[in-house]
A protein has these predicted regions:
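Alpha-helical segment proximal to the catalytic Tyr-Lys
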Residues: 126, 170-174, 231
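Conserved glycine-rich cofactor-binding loop
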Residues: 7, 14-15
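Short, small/polar-rich loop/turn modules that mediate ligand/substrate recognition or access, typified
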Residues: 173, 178, 233-235, 241
């Protein structure tokens, strides 16, 4: 699944799933523009990619800030000539029961997890339309499909990404641009590392494959959807959850 000659823009790339996606895309030959808030971690990631012979550039930004997104994608296109692949991975949690949830925490999660995807898609589509080729991949979540108590904001944002994915797939499909989502289940990341051992053990009991997933499992799905092998797949939600949710 060579991605040689392709250019990817990955948000939430400083750690976890986003970082692993960037590394895998670069390994397959894509030039990678990595975006997140943490400049130091982005610089380390770019160094790792370039030291391995790849091409990469870092863009420290707030993905929910429209002007910062415009500036970063414009700069990425100026540097690499285009953006072929967009991976909307940026995500945060602000967990609380809905009756106690602060409006600021609702807004922050929706802005980072959902609005940022809309902003990035809007900025990369002209480049993709021009070349009549594009791959938009939104990282949603199993909780956007089945809900989760205490995560009304997170679940709503991830469910919104699924609806956005299908709408964009219909809008741009005629120009050879696909838009798909990847829905991870329980993945070992910094976001899940803070959970109690008891919670993790109970979660694993619900997974037919009997293990927690890794960022590499998600990145493999992203690389596939970014490749020519997935050229006839669009508007699809690819579950990467070990069987925790089926159907």
């Amino acid at each position: 699944m060579s991605l040689s000659g392709r250019v990817a823009f990955v948000t939430g790339a400083s750690q976890g799933i986003g970082r692993t996606c960037a590394l895998r895309l670069a390994k397959e030959g894509a030039a990678v523009a990595v975006a997140a808030r943490n400049q130091e971690k982005l610089t380390e990631l770019v160094a790792e990619i370039t030291n391995a012979g790849g091409k990469a550039a870092a863009f420290a930004l707030d993905v929910a800030d429209e002007e910062q997104v415009k500036s970063a994608i414009k700069a990425a296109i100026a540097q690499f000539g285009k953006v072929d692949i967009l991976v909307n991975n940026a995500g945060i949690t602000r967990d609380q029961l809905v009756m106690r949830m602060k409006r600021a925490d609702w807004d922050a999660v929706l802005q980072t997890n959902l609005t940022s995807a809309y902003l990035c898609i809007q900025q990369v589509i002209p480049s993709m339309l021009k070349q009549r080729w594009g791959r938009i991949i939104n990282i949603t979540s199993i909780f956007g499909q089945m809900g989760q108590a205490g995560q009304a904001n997170y679940a709503a944002s991830k469910a919104g990404l699924i609806g956005l994915t299908m709408a964009i797939a219909r809008e741009v499909g005629s120009r050879n641009i696909t838009c798909n989502a990847v829905a991870p289940g329980f993945i070992e990341t910094a976001m899940t590392a803070v959970l109690s051992d008891e919670f993790k053990q109970n979660a694993v009991k619900q997974i037919p494959l009997g293990r927690v997933g890794s960022p590499d499992d998600v990145a493999a799905a992203v690389v596939f959807l970014a490749s020519d092998d997935a050229s006839y797949i669009t508007g699809h939600v690819l579950n990467v959850n070990g069987g925790m949710l089926m159907g």
